[in-house]
Amino acid sequence: MTEVRRRGRPGQAEPTAQKGAQALERGIAILQYLERSGGSSSVSDISGSLDLPLSTTFRLLKVLQAADFVYQDSQLGWWHIGLGVFNVGSAYIHNRDVLSVAGPFMHRLMLLSGETVNVAIRNGNEAVLIGQKECKSMVRMCAPLGSRLPLHASGAGKALLYPLTEEELVGIVVNTGLRRFTPTTLVDLPILLKNLEQAREQGYTVDQEEHVVGLNCIASAIYDDAGSVVAAISISGPASRLTEDRFISQGELVRDTAKDISTALGLKPPVA
């Protein structure tokens, strides 16, 4: 394959990357200093404490301000930690809360199903694995934490999709397309929508070797106290063991576990 290089002096890209990394390190150092200082400080104190030129410190603060990580007090001119930092921290705490609540239910589901249990969240147009409880079987299906899964072709991904409206689903498909991973991947939009409609009705979705040949998954959505989908829980196992004749019984088990976790997160059951 032909490699295309940008014009420029030899060795130019590496120093540029190093400068970018240095700027990032300094920006993080500023945020850490503000945290140690109770959330606010003057630009001169930040500059002196971190041994940075005043002009560099101010330039970095303006970059952080553009990202809403800091803001400047109009009266005193001091710099304060901004809402962006709170949002990042809240996302981390929220995910940790889901896992801490889900932990005992994941263990129970692993024992009852005999399969590996996973928890995933949506990150843009992908599902990301954030928790896992491995089964005790000699043959088991496991993926590293942080693994990214296609929304349309994985159990957890489809569980994160099926509560969405058709308009939202179409928007995602337009952005990502429907890539084929295996012969059974759902790459036709009407068929995918019908599959998700069925999943919505039964409360769980099935990935029948749609992402990886030989791997079956069953998943269900987890809701928070506001009724928003925050994660998906799934079981995954070899297709030779997690067979089609077990989909209903295992699916109901996964669905009921997702309901229990949602209730523990504060979701109120619908009024009869």
From Swiss-Prot:
Domain (HTH iclR-type) ranges: 21-83
Domain annotation IclR-ED: ranges: 98-267
Domain of life of the native organism: Bacteria
Signal peptide: none
Keywords of the record: DNA-binding, Repressor, Transcription, Transcription regulation
GO MF term list: DNA binding; DNA-binding transcription factor activity
Pfam families given in the database record: HTH_IclR, IclR_C
SMART domains the UniProt entry points to: HTH_ICLR
GO biological process: negative regulation of DNA-templated transcription
InterPro entries xrefs: GAF-like_dom_sf, HTH_MetabolicPath_Reg, Tscrpt_reg_IclR_C, Tscrpt_reg_IclR_N, WH-like_DNA-bd_sf, WH_DNA-bd_sf
Region annotated Disordered, chain positions: 1-20
Binding site for glyoxylate: S154, G155, A156, D207, C217, S234, I235, S236
Gene3D superfamilies per UniProt: 3.30.450.40, Winged helix-like DNA-binding domain superfamily/Winged helix DNA-binding domain
DNA-binding positions: 43-62
Annotated function: Negative regulator of allantoin and glyoxylate utilization operons. Binds to the gcl promoter and to the allS-allA intergenic region.
Protein name, per record: HTH-type transcriptional repressor AllR
Species name: Salmonella typhimurium (strain LT2 / SGSC1412 / ATCC 700720)
Classification of source organism: Bacteria, Pseudomonadati, Pseudomonadota, Gammaproteobacteria, Enterobacterales
